[in-house]
């Protein structure tokens, strides 16, 4: 599958678009609907994936592509790294109150054994340093 391909699931009322998002790996793809993005290991909550096969330029372009999506899109990423990513983000953007607030909420959420995923693309744009 590659950019522009569509998976139609009529019984679920879903048309899932494929986005090419290299960076973490050279062949990474994401699955996108009007309301959801399954980003795999390209975009995490408050972070992004390591560069295993892709280049920094590829990752930059992939994250820029994702950033153009609607703020209302919910991001479902491949791992639950929110707390550690926010701890890092708080060292990069020390004066970002949104990061501090989100970190506090994420710590409480995880303490209760609840997931912090999904997160809206809007909150990602406010708190993700990448």
Which residues are covered by each model-predicted region?
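Accessory terminal helices/loops
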Residues: 64-74, 83-130
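Catalytic core of the metallo-beta-lactamase
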Residues: 1-93
């Amino acid at each position: 599958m590659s950019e522009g391909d569509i998976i139609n699931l009529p019984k679920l009322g879903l048309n899932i678009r494929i986005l090419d998002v290299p960076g973490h790996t050279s062949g990474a793809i994401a699955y996108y609907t009007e309301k959801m993005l399954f980003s795999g290991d390209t975009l995490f909550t408050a972070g992004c994936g390591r560069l295993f096969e892709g280049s920094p330029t590829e990752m930059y372009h992939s994250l820029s592509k994702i950033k153009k999506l609607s703020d209302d899109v919910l991001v479902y990423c491949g791992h639950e790294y929110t707390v550690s990513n926010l701890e890092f983000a708080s060292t990069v953007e020390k004066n970002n109150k949104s990061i501090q607030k989100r970190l506090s909420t994420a710590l409480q959420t995880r303490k209760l054994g609840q997931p912090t995923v999904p997160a809206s693309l809007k909150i990602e744009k406010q708190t993700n340093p990448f």
